[in-house]
């Protein structure tokens, strides 16, 4: 008799009457749930605190606005550096110093530039002629609409802050080149920190940050002109660049270019920025920086305009800003002679009087320096310019010279007409944007070098050229340009005889290149090209090529 088969095993299914999870697992689950709830509560509390803090800050801001008014709140905010709506003693310090007339010597100067009586001393004199107010564009209508208070810092700046100052020779050590630096190879004494991608520094400032390291000597030198120099400008390119122009066994000649600016106002006035186009100069110093043979620093004054000025008319960074340009005849620092020992010793090491019995000072005799390598001032200036402005890899000729060259080489002229100099810090607005973007783009540089003669000009200079009677051709060239010009910057493609075959205003150009690609395709004048990722480069390339298309058939064979 056979045995019965066991019943088939059924799949396991949950049993409503099953035992609860073991105590350890349940405790872990409860702990995890508690942690999640605590985290959520913390996030909610943080958000609530942030909202409360924002609400309190907004309430304090609104209350301050009612009490102080717009201008008063602007002054308060300029001192409230941490934006907590309270003025600490440290934040109030600038006002206290202004009211009491007591400005203590900054600690950085005591630490970085200590006096050593055994070293040589260089005496430097400052020469300063104030800005000619009649060169400002707003002078044409008698400064209509411009508050006299806004220009008070400019009008009151009539002399150098320090007509003369003494420096220890070794304080100029930052001008020494890095080891192995070759003749004409630029290096940065103070590197810039800004680019077209980083934007610019705040306009709403009165006092420069304490200089550090190599900035100290630049700050001290510029302080001879005005007590509030900023060794780094708000806009790129910033800093100080230098190159060797001569080398001997014991000496270097170093040429340098400095981009710096000054804040002419203090509270309760609004900020007023004074930005010279550039400071340039040279120094001849021993290779150990113990002796300075010569030093000179100056703002170039060969153009009709050389200073940009910008001032605020409101209580925030986004307040209305006025912009103008003008001419300063002289801003110059120059050594009165080579550096000389502070203490004079005889052959036995005894200190002797620095004056003869007759009262005349002792005359020092310096050996002649024999240079082994030299570079011209013009070539050194060009290399420093390219270091600051990569768009100058294209050679931009003077206005009339460009048309002479175009006739000789049978090329078109790429011309830019604007108010401020394209290759220094007196340029502003759309001109500044152009030089930092499309004009330094490699494809644009290549096409300009291959197919065009380039030039840029100040509107003021062409207006002056148009009134000259000596050269009718130059008058005609200037007139043809000014006919096509629209404020603030006009780019033109011209025949060698000055005829403008194509042109575009910079503001319009920047507007259309900020469009979306699909909007560019619908534009009747320019369209986005897939050959370049950057629409600005693509559009400027199309502008140049359209100029070639129109102009090349018209060139004289």
UniProtKB/Swiss-Prot annotation:
This is Selenoprotein N. One of its GO terms (molecular function) is calcium ion binding. It comes from the Eukaryota. It comes from Mus musculus (Mouse). Residues 1-42 form the signal peptide. Interacts with RYR1, RYR2 and RYR3. Residues 1-24 are annotated as: Disordered. GO terms for biological process: ATP metabolic process; calcium ion homeostasis; calcium ion import; calcium ion transport; cell redox homeostasis; cellular response to caffeine; cellular response to oxidative stress; collagen fibril organization. Plays an important role in cell protection against oxidative stress and in the regulation of redox-related calcium homeostasis. Regulates the calcium level of the ER by protecting the calcium pump ATP2A2 against the oxidoreductase ERO1A-mediated oxidative damage. Within the ER, ERO1A activity increases the concentration of H(2)O(2), which attacks the luminal thiols in ATP2A2 and thus leads to cysteinyl sulfenic acid formation (-SOH) and SEPN1 reduces the SOH back to free thiol (-SH), thus restoring ATP2A2 activity. Transmembrane segments: none annotated. One of its GO terms (cellular component) is mitochondrial membrane. Residues 67-102 form the EF-hand domain. It is found in: Endoplasmic reticulum membrane. N-glycosylated. Glycans are attached at residues 156, 449, 497. Disruption phenotype: Mutant mice show only subtle alterations in the muscle morphology, ultrastructure and contractility. They display increased muscle stress-sensitivity to physical exercise when performed under stress conditions such as a forced swimming test. Under these conditions, they develop muscle atrophy, predominantly affecting trunk muscles and leading to severe kyphosis. The number of satellite cells in uninjured adult muscle is reduced. The keyword Ligase does not apply. The N-terminus (first 61 amino acids) contains an endoplasmic reticulum addressing and retention targeting signal. The keyword Thylakoid does not apply. Keywords: Endoplasmic reticulum, Glycoprotein, Membrane, Oxidoreductase, Repeat, Selenocysteine, Signal.
